[in-house]
Amino acid sequence: MVVGNDYRNDFSLPGTESHQAQQTMEEKGAAQAGDSIQIVVRDEDGLRTAAHEKRVAAMLKKVAAQDSVTAVVSPYDDKSAVSRDGTVGYATVTLDGLAEEVPKEDRVELIDVAQDFEGDGLRVELGGDAIRSAEEGEGGAAEGAGMLGALIILVFLFGSVVAAGLPVITALFAVGSTMGLIVMASHFVTLADFTPPLMMLVGLGVGIDYALLIFSRYRTELLVEAAGDGSLAGGGGADEGSGRAARKDADRASRPGQERAARVALDAAGRTVFFAGCTVIIALLGMYALGLGSLQGVALAMALTVLVTMLASLTLLPALLSAFGGRIRRNVLKRARRQAARGRKEEGTAWRRWGGGVQRHPWAALLVAVVALGALAAPALNMRLGFADAGNDAESTTSRQAYDLLADGFGPGFNGPLIVVADGSDADGGSDAGGGSDANGGSGADGEEKGEPVKDAAGTLRTTLEDTTGIAAVSPAIPTKDPSVALLIAYPASAPQAEATSDLVSSLRDDILPRVEQETGTQFLVGGATAAAEDFSWKVQDRVPVFVAIVVGLSALLLMAVFRSVLIPLKAALLNLLSIGASLGAVTLVFQEGWFGVQQGPVEAFIPVMIFAIVFGLSMDYEVFLLSRIHEEWEHTKDPSHAVREGLAHTGKVITAAAAIMIVVFAAFILSPDRMLQQFGLGLAVAILLDAVLIRCLIVPAVMQLLGRHAWWLPAPLAKLLPRVRIERHEQRGPESGQGAPEAPGQGDYADAGLRR
């Protein structure tokens, strides 16, 4: 029976040097069974006093008696565990499993037990991944803030809590259902522990967005029906002031119109939502092609989230509309009558006027927007990828304070040591490596110990590393169960996330270690968490071009088939790449450069690909919503300028509302204490803001005006090869379809993507 989740982080990359080093340590018995934590103690007057030794011994005795603890090494048992000035020391506590396998309550109790011994000048802090995860909150505040913000926007848009609640209910149901599936899947597929909040973030944003578009079209069709049967003018139906019986009779009488409105909304906006959802899923599944450990599981989980939210919008939402249709209809008509009584201007006038202004000065609009996006994207060129560590935690946490104490006492590189594996198991005693066979006593038959060659090689390496710029200290060779394998721990002079440390790893692998290998005939591998983070970052950078090509290529083919154009997909791809670059530039400025007082550090290695996948898909949504309406007008009028103005007029308000909701949901995650979620939320919020403001309002109308009729050009040979895919409902315009009939007040106000009947 499967109970609970089994989330686990796996950033190992088979084929990388750090992964090979880790495998060697596991095979040769050098890797401990469980994770370890450090209990850091400090006294400015020195730790080597009888009183402190007694207090620390009592603390460690009690710690050793705790559940999940298998071994404890006192700082007084290892001279290297006390700083040179004697003020900082650390005890190593080995757990009986990996950090995620040890119950959180056991880890919290360890913190409490150890810190109970503070006093008389002794300071006690705890560090390690097990401690960091124990201090993490359960979350929920960011998600709640996002939902509240989205609900407020919807209430202002629709003027009704019931109407505003339907998209939120649909999104919550979809996300909740997917969460249950993912919890079960975590027992069979590797899923990172940050998968649930990412699913919540994407699911809420996309789910509310999709439901909003269908619901908006439904409201529009209710107004069309009301305009046709006289209800809108007050000649039919019953408002809230009528009796209950009268309202029920009116609801029954309007039931066929409600059902027709729901069918049209699904047939029109539903097609758009389906296509938009498919583009997001394609982009997310593109991450799977990267082959980056648990990131593949994250890609599948988020793709499933989008799929379920899309299906919920196409199935659950119509059911809710059926249940609340009468009440929604009364609210829609009541609001429309109030707007008519106020003499409100035709909806979309402001957007139509804006489009005309951009069309009169297309080059100026294009230049301003592109320069702004380019300037914001420029910092992304200097982006450094990596992983946050305890040095990025809040200063109030014990893990951050332990990190700082160790850096003060032992140097900044102590928190990110490099583990060098010396593997002589494949070394040939008769190697031609500079006479190494003679120096090592080339005849094992003479009785020399098997471990002597690797011991000598490790000694040679240690001497070399001690003279290497950028290395502060090197441990003596550490033997393993296999005498042909030994370990050395090299402590960089720079912090784990510093660029100098990254350069040091490259220098060791490309220059220093190959020379020692040639001299000794022993293979050396650089491993450890710091080296593994570098490997992951480099692998991401190597595979990103393929990933981008797959996502952009497939999305462009879909757009080409839908809009029968070569230039439209090309324009969409370039603009999306520009907005994504700008959002990554914003993330770089804030989190890497430390703008607004944020702790400086690298951008999480997987953030760029995840932001690219999600933003590219969502940007395509807005592209499809807008261009579908423009395309429809173009097919009927063959006037490109008119088509663009009408496209903006009929989609501007709903795209703005949808974008505002996504921005609020995504930006709420900046409130999360998790640095990775903060980066993700900021990147997505900035990307959607730029897409809705600069791209949809300036660049798209400017480019479409400049392209004119050429925007819809498609070579005849290519037209024959591409399948015909239509999003907009293609029917003859006339009285039955609403053409020629007076537009219902507020109809344009709530048009989804402008996809008419």
Positions of the model-derived regions?
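Juxtamembrane "helix-exit" motif at the C-terminal end of transmembrane alpha-helices
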Residues: N5-R8, I39
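Membrane-embedded transmembrane helical bundles of large multi-pass transporters/channels
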Residues: M1-N5, V69, R84-G86, G97-L385, ...
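Structured non-transmembrane domains adjacent to transmembrane bundles in polytopic membrane proteins
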Residues: S12-S36, D43-G128, N382-V598, P602, ...
